[in-house]
Amino acid sequence: MPGIILATASYDHTIKFWDPPSGGCYRSIDCGEFHINRLEITHDKLYIAAAGNPQTRLFEVNTNNNSPAMSFDGHKGNVTGVGFQKEGKWMYTGSEDGTVKIWDLKAPGCQRDYECSAPVNTVVLHPNQAELISGDQNGSIRVWDLISNTCSRELVPDGEVGITSLTISSDGGLVVASNTKGKCFVWRLGEDDTSRFEPLQKIEAHNAPILKTLFSPDTKLLATCSADHTVKIWNTKKFNVVQTLNGHQRWVWDCAFSNDSAYLVTGSSDHLSRLWDLHQGDAVKTYSGHIKAVNAVALNDLPR
């Protein structure tokens, strides 16, 4: 089993697996007409989820069999978010059909269905594994309590400006939302009540839509990827910019941190993925092979 799994997906309808040090592609999955929006690798590195339109497909990582191991049907529109419960018991998805769903991985089927009032752009799981937080095109953020099976909180930080991405710190203490106007909103979550959002900061981060925002695993950094072709790295103590990563020639769609928070992988409409050394602020490797925009990246370099 490879120690580091790095994968990208593109508008060319392929998923590619890369050897991070050499930059070589060692496997490519042709998904036909299946458009992929998001990628997520399971914690145990056995499967990769490809969220598309309107299915989510699971592929085995350590095989040359490019047929899906499982397919999850039930959404009626683009699946825009996907992730896994820590122990791999279930998967969650969000879709432009206005729903957030939970799926049983052992007996594929929709376990729960949460109705939002607008197309869902992003959904994340709290580290306590007991809440999902979704963001939609109408500008609403909702907290879904998986124990009570209800929406425990709804907030609208910037009117009807669409929420594009959400991220929660690994300690569960902070949540950040980004939107189509290039703003980020930072809240502290209540220790005993995760439906309590204490506003900390509003950041005018970019002059163009933010497409992805992500905390580093050590929670010291925040990355924002934008349609302005840049990625900005923010210190999470004061939320000031510590680096601007320049190099991509078009929109930067997605990013993923290494487990030690020292590296960042990005994907862009310029058809390329890049590996950035965050100590130097430079791209140390470029992954070239897609023939259209790279809109999703996934990295799992957790110790075995």
Curated annotation (Swiss-Prot):
- Which parts of the chain are coiled coil? none
Main localization of the protein? cytoplasm
GO cellular component entries: autophagosome; cell leading edge; cytoplasm; TORC1 complex; TORC2 complex
Localization recorded for this chain is: Cytoplasm
* InterPro entries hit by this protein: G-protein_beta_WD-40_rep, MLST8, WD40/YVTN_repeat-like_dom_sf, WD40_repeat_CS, WD40_repeat_dom_sf, WD40_rpt
List this protein's GO terms for biological process.
aggregation involved in sorocarp development; biological process involved in interaction with symbiont; chemotaxis to cAMP; G protein-coupled chemorepellent receptor signaling pathway; negative regulation of phagocytosis; polyphosphate-mediated signaling; positive regulation of actin filament polymerization; positive regulation of phosphatidylinositol 3-kinase/protein kinase B signal transduction
Family matches, as CDD domains? WD40
Key words, A-Z: Chemotaxis, Cytoplasm, Repeat, WD repeat
Mutant lacking the gene: phenotype: Cells have serious developmental defects, because they are unable to activate the aggregation-stage adenylyl cyclase acaA in response to chemoattractant and are defective in chemotaxis.
Please list the residue ranges covered by the WD repeats: 1-28, 31-69, 74-113, 115-154, 158-197, 205-244, 247-286
GO molecular function annotation: adenylate cyclase activator activity; protein kinase regulator activity
Pfam families to which the protein is assigned, alphabetical? WD40
Note the subunit structure.
Answer: Part of a complex, TORC1, consisting of tor, raptor and lst8. Part of a complex, TORC2, consisting of tor, lst8, piaA and ripA. Additional proteins, such as 14-3-3 and heat-shock proteins, may also belong to the TORC2 complex.
Question: What protein family does this chain belong to?
Answer: Belongs to the WD repeat LST8 family.
**Could you tell me what this protein does?**
Plays a role in regulation of adenylate cyclase and protein kinase B (PKB) activation during aggregation. Involved in both chemotaxis and signal relay.
| Record protein name field | Protein LST8 homolog
Give the originating organism: Dictyostelium discoideum
